[in-house]
Amino acid sequence: MTAMGKSRRMRRSVAAGACVVAVAAVLTGPAQAAADSGGAAAGNGGASTYTKGLGWKLKPSGAEVRFRGLAAVSRSTAWVAGSKGTVLRTTDSGASWANVSPPGAGELEFRDIEAFDRKRAVVLAIGEGEASRVLRTEDGGKTWTEAFRNDEPRAFYDCITFFDSKNGLAMSDPVDGKYRILSTSDGGRSWRVLPSEGMPPAQTGEAGFAASGQCLVSHGRSDVWLATGGGATARVLHSKDRGLTWTAAETPIPAGDPARGVFALAFRSRTQGIAVGGDYRADHASPKASAVSRDGGRTWETSASPVPAYRSGVTWVPHTKSVALAVGPTGTDVTVDGGRTWKAFDTGSFDTVDCAEDFGCWASGEKGRIARLEP
């Protein structure tokens, strides 16, 4: 979900400083009406509040579909992907959105998108058999090329990630008892299924959740993590060699049901990670729905003060050591201590969240909702 584009060092420093001050204000300042900031509230029915510093500002998309795929390129540029084969792109900070959906894709369900810049993006459609596809564009969505169409009836692809502009992976629910991994080394132009010998067996009923495009995430040149649910325990699988071999670790996030498990991961380094999830059913509680790892995903512990409900998306705020955002149907939470404790600061519904290197943080979800984090 994260864009590959980079910004200049000075811009990073300024953005990081503003971020730290603003997020601290979010946690310590009194709530105030969104109208005070002169923008539209991102919460439900206008009931959401902005606190001192930052808040979500809705960026009307003109669409009614659900956007579970999101790639933040910068504060000005973002891509979203969703149901009914819909892909939108903004290059003016969300003031307008161009419909750049692939022709003839109306029956596809896009759940993940990776953008390298304002021109190049790779989008994943999910579903059984041929419904799982990968498409790519190099001209801002004017034209699209189908790069992969699944021909295994039992495969169901959930998420996609890139290490850089050339190398990436996609993951499918288990086939013959093991997760299936696709690999590309040419920016998504071609894909191959990796050997399964290095993949540990899946648990009975275990699968990934195509809820936010964050069930498969990477950091650096070769580390990648895979989130699971539906089995007896919610696990995180880790590969240090771009998907050739994997190790599995149990998390304390509740599982044991097809609706429960780890829905999203975020790693700010090879060692420091956050997992969020829970039970996506609105009438079921989600205690212990967030966990942290300090050893690259080998071990996980429940947050001392977890997110208050099911969360489907999570992202680190760039250029900080301990600030992250988590989103779900009932709101947004922020942590300033690396995931140990979380505090809610918005009640609007979002499925996924992503931050660019220049501190352009975006969120998207149901009914065409897209927002950017702003003062």
Q: What are the residue ranges of the model-derived segments?
A:
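Exposed boundary/loop context
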Residues: M10, A22, G38, G205-E206, ...
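Secretory targeting and sorting signals
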Residues: T2-A35
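N-terminal low-complexity, Pro/Thr-rich disordered segments
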Residues: L27-K57
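Residue-level hotspots at or immediately adjacent to binding/recognition sites across diverse folds
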Residues: G46-P375
